[in-house]
């Protein structure tokens, strides 16, 4: 599911935008590339300390979009590339993935699990 170029972007710091929508209103929260942990073939785990509006929206509508990128990775023609991810999400408060992430990021209160259905390079 995830290309070598995508994995290269994750190795470079950059901002990740997480877009949710409920009640006809979009909400955007942010995190960092370095916080994304890939598990299984199409799942990404993200530590969550706040993300209250994100969680409320996901409880109503689990569809999410994420964008991320790095100016340090070669794109189609020039330096800098980005990706658009689409999928569904849920928050984990227990289980093996939660424990693994809590050990790695002690500040988290929950883990955002994104099941990616599409990963498209945009630059």
Residue positions per predicted region:
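Binding-site signature for planar aromatic cofactors or substrates
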Residues: 1-123
């Amino acid at each position: 599911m995830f290309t070598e170029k995508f994995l290269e972007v994750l190795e470079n710091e950059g901002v990740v935008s997480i877009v949710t929508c409920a009640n006809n209103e979009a909400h955007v929260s942010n995190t960092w590339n370095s916080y994304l942990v890939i598990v299984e073939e199409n799942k990404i785990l993200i530590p969550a300390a706040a993300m209250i509006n994100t969680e409320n929206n996901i409880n109503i509508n689990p569809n999410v979009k994420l964008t991320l990128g790095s100016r340090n990775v070669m794109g189609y023609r020039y330096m800098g590339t980005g990706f658009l991810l689409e999928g569904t999400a849920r928050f984990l408060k227990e289980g093996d993935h939660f424990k693994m992430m809590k050990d790695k990021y002690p500040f988290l209160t929950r883990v955002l699990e994104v099941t990616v259905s599409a990963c498209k390079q945009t630059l």
